[in-house]
Amino acid sequence: MSGPSDYQPSNPALQWIERRLPILGLMHSSFVAYPTPRNLNYWWTFGAILSFMLGMQILTGVILAMHYTPHADLAFKSVELIVRDVNYGWLLRNMHACGASMFFFAVYVHMLRGLYYGSYKEPREVLWILGVIIYLLMMATGFMGYVLPWGQMSFWGATVITNLFSAIPYFGESIVTLLWGGYSVGNPTLNRFFSLHYLLPFLIAGVVVLHVWALHVAGQNNPEGVEPKSEKDTVPFTPHATIKDMFGVACFLLLYAWFIFYMPNYLGDADNYIPANPGVTPPHIVPEWYYLPFYAILRSIPNKLAGVIGMFSAIIILCFLPWLDAAKTRSSKYRPLAKQFFWIFVAVCILLGYLGAQPPEGIYVIAGRVLTVCYFAYFLIVLPLLSRIETPRPVPNSISEAILAKGGKAVASVAIALVAAGALFLGSLQDARANEGSDKPPGNKWSFAGPFGKFDRGALQRGLKVYKEVCASCHGLSYIAFRNLAEAGGPSYSVAQVAAFASDYKIKDGPNDAGDMFERPGRPADYFPSPFPNEQAARAANGGAAPPDLSLITKARSYGRGFPWFIFDFFTQYQEQGPDYVSAVLQGFEEKVPEGVTIPEGSYYNKYFPGHAIKMPKPLSDGQVTYDDGSPATVAQYSKDVTTFLMWTAEPHMEARKRLGFQVFVFLIIFAGLMYFTKKKVWADSH
């Protein structure tokens, strides 16, 4: 990609290959001898991070696809079975799901770095446009991937976003029908999205090759925005840039691992742990955080077609940036006004993301319209105007001259600002997903909380007893097999105890030789049976409300923590919104409805349930279940024990996740330290 190479391998076999297919020379000229500006800072490391993350997403995605079932009736269950029954399936899913967010985080940093340092200017226009194409492909891939788990937010997100194409005149309805494969989102839609989600990453990889090719033709930009003029301005890509990139990737992996092992659901949505239900619309349909700024632009424009045009224009306009900004000076380091407006633009994007997570009503709509105007004004008014009126500061004559005055404090402060802004952004997302119209649940001290938390075996066994004697008459545990009770990290029953426990249940099986269905005693390999044969029977027995399956209830329920707790949650690894909520609801029943509160007939008042009206009668009362270990037979103890058990049913491999996370963190810290000191040694003679 860097041009002809005179590299010749010393090995005779490799020489034979090189004469016929000079692939080794191409690799040497592109990734070893390639001259790299010596003043590149760590913002340039995100290119290597993105390459690593793309490879990681493709690898984990291919393995997950081996076990995934793209069928509307089986997709949700297949994902859960991957997590529970495939060896390290929980790790693969966490890597892939959290990896999508990390991929977008890295690409946003990469794009903002290009904006700040003018990496879109001549001669890098094609390089920049290819980057925008990659970003568009990433957005399409991420959206289709989010649909695949077939949870509530997946289904309704697909419905809302695909419906946008109906705004296109003449062809819109036909496009929507083609995407759906029918007249509503369903199984054909899921199959289409799975196929495209599998294909697009390889297309992204192909465009990345073109992107890297264009980079090697035009050369890398640098913080000063001046082209290398002599050998003193550059260093060989390997080992200098390679080692620096490896250190940067190692540091990024620490953040990545933080989410994988300790905060896997921090960036997700509780509603997506509920199977897709076309008959129940979520209170807030909110896309993933990396789409929120554009979602805010879409919703801020009242006309549907204009909103769609505005949303796509907000991305496409990036392709025209090389011609909108005609300033001769590339880097904003030497453009005081451009630097100020750049940070204003970053603030506008963050605020748009905040608004995208809020309900489309009142002041949020007005603010969205103002910020949408600001977003487009930056590209269409500010940049063209600045290129004509701004007087830049003197630019260094060469890269080597600029290195003498280099400092790192600004980079550190910008990094801190980005982390703080990102925390605020993610916190706004949690606020939007709060349970409205109810008191916030009180916190609890859970044994499984924190990086070294473990399940209390006694609480798990007591919780199972409460479930069996109280909850099992209405609620199933369809994702838990009896054998799971004997697995490490669970209630710690012996194989014999599990067999005896399973035999108490009657399992419908068959057909037998006569073609009839029959009942038999349960076996360890069987799953907990549902108390009802189907959903219609469940509704008929419960006044029209279908009791939810409890396997995932502590993940499928949550509440917004609000400011500033969501910031602290990231650092304290607080992930117990679900258990706190479930425990609070079990204890939140009150016989007397407060004055001024009206609930429908046949409902019960619960101060923690959204809207306070719940169809489920009070399930627990003091003395209802007898414990053999002397634990108090109170509602508070029952609720805490059964919630602990339900947290285990939601994630049986939690202890393994945290244990492996500690080992990975130790390795990454040591690896990052080795890379840092190696980098110091390699670069010692280059400054």
Curated annotation (Swiss-Prot):
Subcellular location field: Cell inner membrane
Record-listed heme b b562 binding positions: H96, H197
Keyword Metal-binding appears in the UniProt entry: yes
CDD domains with a match to the protein in the record: cytochrome_b_C, Cytochrome_b_N
Binding site for heme b b566: H110, H211
Residue sites binding heme c per the record: C471, C474, H475, M616
SUPFAM superfamilies the record matches: a domain/subunit of cytochrome bc1 complex (Ubiquinol-cytochrome c reductase), Cytochrome c, Transmembrane di-heme cytochromes
Membrane-topology annotation of the record: Multi-pass membrane protein
Chain segments annotated as transmembrane: 46-66, 126-146, 160-180, 199-219, 247-267, 305-325, 337-357, 363-383, 410-430, 666-678
One GO location term (cellular component): plasma membrane
UniProt keyword list: Cell inner membrane, Cell membrane, Electron transport, Heme, Iron, Membrane, Metal-binding, Respiratory chain, Transmembrane, Transmembrane helix, Transport
Top-level taxon: Bacteria
A GO MF term: electron transfer activity
Domain Cytochrome c: 458-643
PROSITE patterns named among the record's database cross-references: CYTB_CTER, CYTB_NTER, CYTC
Modification note: The protein is post-translationally processed into cytochrome b and c1. This occurs by processing between residues 434 and 435 without processing between cytochrome b and the N-terminal of the putative signal sequence domain.
GO biological process terms on file: proton transmembrane transport; respiratory electron transport chain
Cofactor: binding comment: Binds 2 heme b groups non-covalently. Heme 1 (or bL or b562) is low-potential and absorbs at about 562 nm, and heme 2 (or bH or b566) is high-potential and absorbs at about 566 nm. Binds 1 heme c group covalently. Heme 3 is covalently bound to cytochrome c1.
Region described as Internal signal sequence: spans on this chain: 404-434
Subunit structure: The main subunits of complex b-c1 are: cytochrome b, cytochrome c1 and the Rieske protein.
Family: Belongs to the cytochrome b family.
Role noted for this protein: Component of the ubiquinol-cytochrome c reductase complex (complex III or cytochrome b-c1 complex), which is a respiratory chain that generates an electrochemical potential coupled to ATP synthesis. c1 functions as an electron donor to cytochrome c.
Name this protein carries in UniProt: Cytochrome b/c1
Lineage: Bacteria, Pseudomonadati, Pseudomonadota, Alphaproteobacteria, Hyphomicrobiales
Name of encoding gene: fbcH
